[in-house]
Amino acid sequence: RFRHLFMYETEYYAFSERAANAYLGTALVSSSLSDKMRLQKMHNRVGAELELPYLGRTFVFGNAYHYNYYFRNAYYVGGVLQRHQIKDTDLSVGLQWHKKVGGFSITAEGEQTFVGKMTGTQLKGTLSYALDAQNKLSAGAMLHSAMPNFNYLLYQSDYKNYNWYHLDDFSKENIQ
C-alpha cells in the first residue's frame, strides 16, 4: 500500500523594546527595537509499505523537507546587504522496518539526505520484550547527523553583537 505524509508548520519569534538596553550592548537604533523571525517548514513524505509474515512490515520512502528561515529586517554593513534568510529544500530517502517475534518487538529506521544542507543521516533502532500485557522492557539507540538549529546559523537584531550568519562555517552535528 502507498502512504503519504504532508506536514506544514510556521514558527514566529518577536523581541521588542521601547528603548535600547546597555546590558545587551550597542544598539543600531535608539528606540522601538524590534527583532522578528519566521520559520516555515514543510515535510512531504511519500512511500510504499509492504507487510509479509516472515519479513515484517517495511516502509520505503522519499522525503522533501522545505524550509524558509528569515528575518524581515534588512541590514547594510559597509554598504553590503547582510544575509537575512536560509531557504532550501533537502531531499532524502529512508526505510522503516518493524517485526514481532514471540514476545520481542524490533524496530529500525534509517534516512539519508542526498541533496541539501540542513539534514543528514539518521539511524534509530529499538528492541523491546513484553513481560506481560502491561509491562515491557525496551532499549534503543539513535545516531543523528544534522546542522544546528537555525538560530545558531543566522540571527539579526537591532543590537550590534546579535547579528550573525554561520551557515557556511558550521558542519553537521553528530548526536548519539
Locate the predicted segments by residue.
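Transmembrane beta-strand segments that form the barrel wall of outer-membrane beta-barrel proteins
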Residues: 103-116
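Residues on the lipid-exposed face of transmembrane beta-strands in outer-membrane beta-barrel proteins
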Residues: 1, 46-50, 93-99, 125-129, ...
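Outer-membrane beta-barrel channels and translocator barrels
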Residues: 53-55, 101-104, 132-134
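Structural signature of outer-membrane beta-barrel domains
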Residues: 7-14, 65-70, 113-117, 144-148
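Outer-membrane beta-barrel translocator domains and adjoining extracellular loop/strand segments
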Residues: 14-21, 71-79, 119-125, 150-158
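Residues that define the transmembrane beta-barrel architecture of outer-membrane proteins
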Residues: 38-44, 87-93, 119-123, 171-175
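Outer-membrane beta-barrel translocator/channel fold
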Residues: 134-176
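Membrane-embedded beta-strand positions of outer-membrane beta-barrel proteins
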Residues: 2-6, 60-63, 108, 127, ...
